[in-house]
């Protein structure tokens, strides 16, 4: 993905997008099987960034609902009246330059329904279990 950094006091004073790269560790054993990442609207902030990175991995699938967003390296400041304000200071993007501040879409969208909740069934977990059973690679 990409990240921009604040460069001035103006509303749109940000750097050009800078690519962010992650490389796997080469000095230890790595998990080589499929992974299901479960999300919903309560997955936000650092989780949003984690989900965005996991979506780029060939053996990872994101299952559930769109994340709640809110990455972007939050900045906190105090206003002259004593109130604190917190906001994203560094817009973040996926590899296709889609802004992720407002959430990351799942690969497989699953909604929890009231009937399953009443029965104690977690539709997202059950979908992930089924996916992993069928993708044992």
Please describe what each predicted stretch is.
Residues 44, 57-70:
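Short, well-structured beta-strand/strand-turn elements
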Residues 1-34, 72-76, 89-93, 99-100:
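Gly/Ser/Thr-rich loop/hinge elements
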Residues 32-34, 58-61, 135:
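Loop/turn elements at helix/coil->beta-strand transitions in domains of secreted/extracellular proteins
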Residues 106-137:
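Low-complexity, Gly/Ser/Thr/Pro-rich intrinsically disordered linker/tail segments
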Residues 35, 54, 97, 128:
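Terminal peptide-recognition signature
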Residues 46-50, 59, 120-128:
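Stable alpha-helical elements in mature extracytoplasmic
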Residues 29, 41-45, 115-123:
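Soluble non-cytosolic domains of exported or imported proteins
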Residues 6-7, 38-42, 64-67, 88-90:
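Active-site-proximal beta-strand/loop segments in catalytic clefts of secreted hydrolases
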């Amino acid at each position: 993905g990409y990240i921009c950094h604040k460069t001035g006091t103006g509303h749109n004073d940000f750097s050009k997008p800078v690519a962010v790269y992650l490389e796997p560790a080469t000095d230890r054993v790595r998990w080589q099987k499929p992974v299901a990442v479960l999300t919903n609207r309560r997955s936000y902030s650092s989780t949003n960034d984690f989900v965005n990175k996991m979506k780029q991995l060939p053996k990872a699938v994101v299952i559930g609902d769109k994340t709640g967003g809110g990455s972007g390296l939050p900045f906190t400041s105090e206003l002259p009246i004593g109130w604190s304000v917190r906001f994203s200071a560094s817009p973040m993007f996926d590899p296709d330059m889609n802004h992720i501040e407002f959430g990351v879409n799942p690969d497989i969208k699953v909604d929890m329904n009231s009937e399953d909740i009443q029965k104690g069934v977690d539709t997202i977990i059950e979908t992930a279990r089924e996916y992993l059973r069928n993708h044992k690679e």
